[in-house]
């Protein structure tokens, strides 16, 4: 009869977990998503071929606890051209610019989103742009980006 000792795993640092009785709601100014509408065809060197502003409103549920949020603009379908570009498969790349904290959003990474300390709500402003990467393709196009939120 052989016996094997099972490895023992110990969780440490659990005393550093802070439980808060708060929640935050996140509302997109365009609940149906960002719609660029009809875009004329373009040449590969056309630069930005469409731009659409949108905002995200973050609200506390009425509590007074301080907390911050991180966000991940996670690509559900599609491939990235680089950390900040989503290939739209139509000769363009989708980029999202954070106008509140000027920088291009890096997809599939958590980053600072909103500090709710001493605030009941925070509004963030963004611009979504389609930048030409090739000859414009006719037809409908759609990609899904999911906003994941972590409390920190």
Residue map of PLM features:
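Mature extracellular/passenger domains of Gram-negative fimbrial/pilin and adhesin proteins
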Residues: 1, 5-152
């Amino acid at each position: 009869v052989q016996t094997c000792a099972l490895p023992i795993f110990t969780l440490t640092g659990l005393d550093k977990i802070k439980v808060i009785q708060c929640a935050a709601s996140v509302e997109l100014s365009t609940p149906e998503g960002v719609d660029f509408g009809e875009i004329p065809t373009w040449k590969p060197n056309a630069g930005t071929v469409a731009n659409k502003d949108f905002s995200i409103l973050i609200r506390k549920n009425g509590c007074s606890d301080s907390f911050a949020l991180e966000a991940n603009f996670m690509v559900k379908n599609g491939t990235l051209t680089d950390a900040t570009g989503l290939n739209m498969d139509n000769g363009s790349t989708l980029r999202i610019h954070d106008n509140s904290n000027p920088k291009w959003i890096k997809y599939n990474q958590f980053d600072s989103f909103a500090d709710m300390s001493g605030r009941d709500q925070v509004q963030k402003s963004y611009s979504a742009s389609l930048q030409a990467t090739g000859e414009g393709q006719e037809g409908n196009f759609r990609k899904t980006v999911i906003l994941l939120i972590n409390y920190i």
